[in-house]
Every structure is written in C-alpha cells, then in structure tokens.
C-alpha cells in the first residue's frame, strides 16, 4: 500500500499598467509543496516500509503586453511538478511462474519535474474570433519511465515464492527461481529530456451558415 501526505501553499502577485505607452498585465507566484510518502510491501517473507519526504519550490511568471486592442503577446516561464502514480510506488509486486515474469513498483521514484517556457501571439480579428501562434519548450529534469530487465533471477526481487501460482513450473521447481531466466518489469527514474513544439489555432463562429447551423 502507498500513502501520501501533501502540504503546500501559494503566493501570487498580479499587476497591470502601462510602460512607454504599452499596456501590459503581469503575474508572478511561488508554490511550495511538501510530500511525505509511505510505501509498504513484502520483501522476502517480511513486510517492509519505505518512507521519505521531499520538498518542491515552484516559481512561475507570466506577462502579456497589448500592442493594440486586437493583439496580445504572451510569455510565461514556470517550474512544474507531478507526482508518480501511487500504483508505481509500491515495493510489492506480482509474478508469473509460467512465463518467468515479475512486475513490481519502485518506492524511490522521483516526481516529474520540468521548467516550461511558453510564447504566444493572439490576434482577435473579429468578435468571438481569434488566430494564435504559440511556441513552447519544456526542459524535463526527471520523469518515471517503464523498464524491462532480462536475465534476472526471481530471488533477486525479494518477493516470496508464495506469490507464484502453485501449479506453475517455477513454484514446482524452486531451482528455477535462482536461474537468470526471468524478466523483471518495473519503473525507474528517467535521465531527463527536452520537448519543443509549435501550436497554431483559429477560432471563428460560422455566421455564414444558414438556419440553425448559423454561428
């Protein structure tokens, strides 16, 4: 089983004004999150519990200049964090003694952490209409990824033989549990990545359509 206790807070500052004749809106903030995690499972024949606490300080800022009444430019930068799913954090697992396959979680997974950059230009060319172009980049510092390890032994996983089906070859022949014929599927910490992209969007009401289809 896995439990999480999360505490946090957020401080936000907003401002509007004009600089050198250019109107703008500005927002900045800092979010703090403290996560206490407890993961319990079976290792060998004994229950084991992993506990840890980690803290995240997540600053963010966005600004939106208004060159004209119909054009808005937007820029934003933010540190973001998403915790791993609870199911991937359990130290326990399951085993298939017919196909020599073991699946279990990893209580030491790091959260998804990244710095996100966004730039956008929006043109409101008509009522209820917009054309926008946006570019984004995400510098990912850590993220959980699935890993498949071959040539492993069942005994190295720490799982008890009781998780095997009593009719499986691996249970009936215990020597197979120490042979490197097993495939272990788990989740590990990724080394990071960089994502880039562009988005183009158009929105407009269909005023030219007839009858009930109009707008």
Predicted regions and their residues:
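Residues that define the transmembrane beta-barrel architecture of outer-membrane proteins
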Residues: 3-9, 53-57, 103, 113-117, ...
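Structural signature of outer-membrane beta-barrel domains
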Residues: 6, 31-37, 78-84, 126-128, ...
